[in-house]
Amino acid sequence: DKRTMAPSSLLFYLGVNKRVGGLLHHNLFFDESFDQHAIDIYEQPRWPEKPLFYVCCPSKTDPSVAPEGSENIFILIPLAPDLQGDDEPTREKYYQMVMERLEAFTGTSVRDAVVYKRSYAHREFQQDYHAYKGNAYGLANTLLQTAFLKPKMKNRKVKGLYFSGQLTTPGPGVPPSLISGEVVAGEVSKMLGLPKN
């Protein structure tokens, strides 16, 4: 609990059996208070009353990701990590809330055309990725958790224990995570006296 975690997320993956006008590939729904949503994530962690959210509709730019005449829609609601109450009724409440706003924005009924729906949040981040407190992004990018203040690759207390990935040096993202793994592999090889590949 000494570190500040980045947000978690409530995600909805939707298959819709019709085209939805009014959406682009990337859509930000910042139609409610940004400040209040930030308070609900960082200062007073709780489920937001009026969440901001992101909608990705990749079928707008790549029709091959959905059957002809259909859409593939992804919805992301940023949330505080470690929230209690991540259950199906809560998820359904947020689904209805964002879909109401999405339908109002597009002027199109979408819910009746959903043929596939899956939600993903704290529980799955913990179960599938062992994500601390169910967070989605690891450590928050704060001044005291960047550059040389990031967690080190080599454990100071346990000999031979190394870490790699986005939470260590050099940082988040796929390329830095791969570089991190290469560096750790080199350190372990050196420790074991193995030749470099």
Predicted regions and their residues:
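Flavin-binding catalytic cores
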Residues: R19-V20, R46-P48, E88-Q127
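A conserved FAD-binding loop/helix module that cradles the flavin
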Residues: Q166-S189
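Mid-domain catalytic core of redox enzymes
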Residues: D1-A66
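Short glycine/proline-enriched loop/turn "hinge" motifs that connect secondary-structure elements
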Residues: P63-S70, K152-R156
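Active-site-proximal substrate-binding core of FAD-dependent oxidoreductases
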Residues: K190-N197
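Amphipathic alpha-helix from the class-I
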Residues: P78-G85
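A glycine-rich dinucleotide-binding beta-alpha-beta segment and adjacent secondary-structure elements
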Residues: Y54, T108-P170
